[in-house]
């Protein structure tokens, strides 16, 4: 391995494998080993066409000369195999798994690949959206969700894993999950069950340009989705996968790499060989990987506010990422973090529930037990609205109700330093929230929003048993979180803090926390970005912050040791400046 903490890998698509010459391959390899330093490739055997065996063997031979490890890969897309396939309206040429010729083709692909490699990965087109007559007939009375979840498990067992292991009993098969987690169940992706039958998994961390692509993904997903899938298959999440497409500037591409690395992956996958060989966007990668590798050697395990996202769930899409973008360290998990009296005090005692959490039919009872035992649960407004309708027993925990009206706010009332006092701040433009009401003094408001003489709470809490239940009202358009005034964001961060560290400042800065008293800051290089001054609050008495080095050469204009401004109220406060496109990591010295 070129790096101590991760392998750098790339992917070679079948069409390119078929046309590349040995001379071109060696020229590309020289470029990549100079600028990126590749440890491993996944060599694709099928994507609309089979890669020829002689070409595969040539690529493997050349990679051996460069000391590059080679595994296989397949992408489950295929052209029409006969005239009848023209009736099937297939997105991206994905397979119809009710069609026997296509089923036979996939089985053939699996067997072919297993005969060439001891490991292969399935790219994230392993889904179905086909609604042809054959699919309608086989679905019967089931919903498309039910049908596709069952169908893709059957396809995995009977057409991929079974045939491959029959050819090569030692084969290891990896399934890559896409970056559209909220839609998995509607297309057949089934991580809750697929994790049990595949040897390992992989994570799509492509976020590209968040505002100019059809998915509109917050950059933080490149970190948070890695962490979510680590909870899905602990120790078996093989890595994060991103690409240079729809990246209008260097930083847009590089930030995908940074955030993937901050999540501590085993592998960092840069899709794909022909897209990065000779691409100027790839030229800084090796330089930055050296820096990241040195930093990662000092970091413990990532930690943050656990966010419960059950399997096959949808709702509040990517709210955990929007919150991560405003500086709250997030730790999405697939199982509810229940605890008892003997559980250690820490992040496990705080959990965020979103509308996706409502997929769990036992969620309110789990929530009640969690809070009563001393936990602090935060729920989004979308969770609260859905729970009031679906699980009215939620009223046991709070007086909050939903009016079915909208709160338009440009004035905010935030806590002042002195108890019982308030500060007032205006936003640059109105922000809309769902209007939730509460009964004064039964539920206590931390922060209000509104206009003129009408305000309602957007952050309030109840006490229940030994715990605390907070309702966090998020904007109707989640990206409007970025537009909230700094004092509003600071109040949110303080209430949601699960790591003992919170930021006082504006948006566009993410905080990454680890379980060994280390943390990092990253200021996004997005439109309109600029250096930001902020304050950092750390629980307890802290002597100093020591910068974690990213090279053997000290950074001339960055202090290596930061002394506190002051200590007050059980916290130590530091001041600092963050620069767009630069990451800064520190060790807390007590």
What are these regions (language model features)?
Residues 20-30, 323-347:
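A short, well-structured beta->alpha microelement
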Residues 1-4, 33, 57-71, 157-172, ...:
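Surface-exposed amphipathic alpha-helices with a cationic face
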Residues 34-49, 90-146:
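Active-site groove signature of glycoside hydrolases
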Residues 5-27, 55-116, 129-132, 158-159:
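Active-site-adjacent "subsite" loops/lids of carbohydrate-active enzymes
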Residues 355-589:
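A conserved amphipathic helix/loop scaffold
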Residues 340-358, 378:
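Short, well-ordered secondary-structure micro-motifs within conserved domains or adaptor modules
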Residues 44, 83, 118, 123-124, ...:
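Hydrophobic targeting/anchoring helices
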């Amino acid at each position: 391995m070129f790096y101590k903490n991760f392998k750098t890998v790339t992917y070679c698509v079948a069409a390119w494998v078929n046309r590349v010459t040995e001379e071109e391959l060696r020229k590309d390899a020289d470029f990549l080993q100079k600028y990126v330093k590749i440890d491993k490739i996944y060599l694709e055997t099928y994507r609309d066409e089979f890669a020829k065996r002689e070409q595969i063997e040539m690529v493997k031979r050349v990679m051996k000369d460069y000391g590059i490890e080679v595994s296989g890969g397949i992408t489950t897309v295929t052209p029409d195999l006969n005239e009848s396939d023209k009736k099937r309206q297939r997105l991206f040429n994905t397979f119809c798994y009710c069609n026997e010729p296509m089923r036979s083709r996939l089985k053939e692909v699996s067997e072919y690949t297993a005969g060439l490699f001891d490991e292969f990965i399935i790219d994230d087109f392993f889904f179905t959206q086909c609604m042809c007559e054959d699919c309608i007939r086989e679905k019967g009375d089931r919903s498309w969700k039910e049908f596709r979840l069952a169908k893709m498990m059957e396809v995995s067992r009977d057409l991929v894993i079974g045939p491959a292991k029959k050819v090569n009993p030692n084969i290891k098969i990896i399934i890559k999950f896409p970056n559209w987690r909220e839609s998995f169940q509607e297309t057949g992706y089934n991580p809750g069950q697929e994790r049990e039958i595949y040897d390992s998994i992989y994570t799509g961390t492509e976020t590209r340009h968040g505002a100019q692509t059809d998915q509109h993904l917050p950059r933080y997903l490149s970190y948070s989705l890695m962490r979510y899938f680590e909870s899905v298959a602990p120790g078996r999440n093989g890595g994060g996968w991103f690409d240079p497409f729809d990246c209008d500037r260097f930083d847009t591409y590089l930030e995908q790499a940074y955030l993937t690395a901050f999540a501590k992956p085993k592998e960092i996958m840069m899709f794909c060989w022909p897209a990065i060989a000779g691409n100027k966007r790839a030229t800084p990668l090796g330089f930055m990987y050296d820096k990241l590798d040195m930093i990662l050697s000092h970091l413990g395990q990532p930690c943050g506010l656990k966010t419960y996202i059950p399997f096959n769930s949808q709702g509040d899409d990517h709210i955990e990422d929007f919150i991560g973008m405003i500086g709250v360290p997030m730790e999405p998990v697939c199982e509810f973090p229940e605890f008892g009296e003997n559980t250690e005090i820490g992040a496990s005692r705080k959990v965020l529930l979103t509308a996706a959490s409502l997929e769990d039919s036992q969620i309110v009872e789990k929530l009640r037990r969690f809070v009563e035992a001393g936990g602090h649960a935060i729920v989004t407004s979308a969770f609260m609205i859905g729970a009031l309708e679906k699980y009215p027993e939620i009223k046991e925990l709070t007086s909050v109700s939903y009016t079915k009206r909208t709160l338009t706010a440009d004035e905010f009332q935030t806590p002042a330093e002195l108890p019982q006092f308030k500060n007032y701040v205006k936003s640059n433009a109105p922000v809309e929230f769902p209007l939730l009401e509460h009964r004064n003094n039964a539920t206590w408001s931390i922060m209000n929003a509104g206009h003129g003489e009408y305000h309602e709470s957007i952050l309030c809490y109840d006490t229940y048993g030994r715990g605390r239940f907070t309702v966090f009202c998020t904007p109707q358009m989640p990206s409007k979180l970025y537009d909230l005034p700094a004092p509003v964001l600071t109040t949110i961060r303080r209430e949601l803090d699960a790591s003992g560290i919170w930021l006082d400042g504006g948006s566009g800065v993410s905080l990454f926390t680890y379980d060994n008293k280390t943390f990092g800051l990253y200021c996004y290089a997005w439109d309109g970005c600029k250096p930001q001054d902020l304050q950092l609050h750390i629980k307890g008495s802290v002597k100093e912050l020591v910068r974690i080095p990213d090279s053997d050469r000290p950074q001339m204009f960055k202090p290596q040791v930061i002394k506190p401004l002051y200590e007050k109220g059980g916290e130590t406060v530091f001041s600092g400046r963050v620069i767009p496109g630069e990451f800064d990591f520190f060790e807390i010295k007590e």
